[in-house]
Amino acid sequence: MSKPSYVKFEVPQELADKVLEAVKKAKDSGKIKKGTNETTKAVERSQAKLVVIAEDVQPEEIVAHLPLLCEEKKIPYVYVPSKKSLGEACGLQVAAASVALMDPGEAKDLVDEIVKRVNEIKGKSS
């Protein structure tokens, strides 16, 4: 199955697992915004430290604007394979198409590592 058009780069599974772990830690010790509307607002206000986007969102238009907006605001973003697992990492009973980490809390070191890896994947030097 091919990736949706909004997925701009491939994220290895082990990195996606670290992203979900960071979301869980940030939920418990920092601050996160759940859902695409809240995530979009956090990015527009340049408050997000990291944006997480699920790869299996239908229709794609729900999150298609996020990578471009993140690039424009210079906010790092990363993908995870499943909106269901992203929702669970946020402590929700439902799926989450996207999440913004506002304050990573105890996940700060993990978030820094994720951002560094994402920049390497995207071919940028950090």
Swiss-Prot record:
* Keywords on record: Cytoplasm, Ribonucleoprotein, Ribosomal protein, RNA-binding, rRNA-binding, tRNA processing
List GO molecular-function terms, semicolon-separated: ribonuclease P activity; rRNA binding; structural constituent of ribosome
Cell location? Cytoplasm
Q: Which Gene Ontology cellular component annotation is one that this UniProt entry carries?
A: cytoplasm
Q: What PROSITE patterns does the record tag this protein with?
A: RIBOSOMAL_L7AE
* Keyword Cytoplasm belongs to the record: yes
State where it is primarily located.
cytoplasm
Question: Where would one find the signal peptide in this protein?
Answer: none
- The superkingdom of the source organism is Archaea
Keyword NADP appears in the UniProt entry? no
Q: Which processes are annotated in GO (biological process)? A: ribosome biogenesis; translation; tRNA 5'-leader removal
Q: What PANTHER family does UniProt report for this protein, alphabetically?
A: RIBOSOMAL PROTEIN L7AE FAMILY MEMBER
Q: What does this protein do?
A: Multifunctional RNA-binding protein that recognizes the K-turn motif in ribosomal RNA, the RNA component of RNase P, box H/ACA, box C/D and box C'/D' sRNAs.
What's the subunit arrangement here? Answer: Part of the 50S ribosomal subunit. Probably part of the RNase P complex.
Q: Which family is this sequence assigned to?
A: Belongs to the eukaryotic ribosomal protein eL8 family.
Q: What is this protein called?
A: Large ribosomal subunit protein eL8
Q: Which organism is it from?
A: Sulfolobus acidocaldarius (strain ATCC 33909 / DSM 639 / JCM 8929 / NBRC 15157 / NCIMB 11770)
Gene symbol here is rpl7ae
